[in-house]
Design a protein with these regions (language model features):
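Glycine-rich phosphate-binding loop used to anchor ATP phosphates in small-molecule kinases
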Residues: 18-48
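Short hairpin/turn module used for nucleic-acid contact or packing/dimerization
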Residues: 41, 54-56, 64-66, 81, ...
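Short N-terminal helix/helix-N-cap motif within the alpha/beta-hydrolase-1
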Residues: 42-45, 68, 124
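Conserved phosphate-donor/acceptor-positioning beta-strand/loop module used by diverse small-molecule
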Residues: 47-71
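Short, solvent-exposed loop/turn segments at secondary-structure junctions
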Residues: 38-41, 62-65, 73, 117-121
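Short beta-strand segments
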Residues: 32-37, 55-60, 113-118, 131, ...
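Acidic-histidine catalytic/liganding microenvironments
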Residues: 37, 51, 107-108
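PAPS-dependent sulfotransferases, especially Golgi type II membrane carbohydrate sulfotransferases
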Residues: 3-28, 70-113, 120-191
């Protein structure tokens, strides 16, 4: 197909080995690791090919909420510099949505969509579905992330120490009068 290069088996193997080695170094001996880097969606084809055993979980959330959360979060990573311009965030988010649609079409049944709002409204039900999808045994600790004491390397370190709660997807609405319609672009999503 146009724009597709042949798969280089050596490069895939090298990527796989380097990535798994890096995970082992950071995982403190854990066998299950979540890599939640914001740009991961760009590499789902590579991940699916080089790491066929990997589960791809796509957390879907209100577009306006995602854009606002990115805009108001300080990221030390230079690759997230687009987060300091609302126009750049909106453009980036459109690209993200287009690429995720492509991945869903290119890899049917390979990506598990987890609806953020549904998770906050029906935590146990949605968490049980996710755990079942992953083929893991249920553990009641899944319902109490605030009690987990292991280290977590994330910009949202404070959030992962809190109970699952509703309302964060509405936070942007407090600032709507000052955004001059910037997030209205996602009108179907912003009710």
């Amino acid at each position: 197909a146009v724009g597709q290069a042949p798969v280089n088996a050596e490069a895939l193997t090298a990527f796989r080995e380097q990535y798994l080695s890096a995970l082992r170094q950071r995982s403190e001996g854990k066998t299950i690791v979540t890599d939640k880097m914001p740009q991961n969606f760009c590499f789902l084809g590579l991940v699916a090919t080089a790491l066929p055993e990997a589960h791809i979980i796509h957390v879907k959330r209100s577009s306006a909420a995602v854009c606002w959360a990115n805009y108001t979060q300080y990221f030390a990573n230079d690759s997230l510099g687009y987060c300091y311009s609302l126009d750049d965030i909106l453009h980036y988010h459109e690209l993200y949505e287009d690429l995720m649609q492509y991945w869903h079409e290119a890899m049917p049944n390979r990506i598990y969509d987890l609806d953020y709002e549904a998770l906050t409204e029906r935590q146990e039900e949605e968490t049980r579905k996710l755990i079942g999808h992953l083929g893991l045994e249920w553990d009641d600790a899944c319902l109490s992330p605030q009690d987990n004491t292991r280290s977590v390397a994330t910009a949202s370190n404070v959030q992962v120490r809190q109970k699952v709660y509703q309302g964060s997807s509405e936070r942007w609405k407090r600032y709507k009068p000052y955004l001059y319609g910037a997030l209205d672009h996602f009108s179907a999503d912003n009710k």
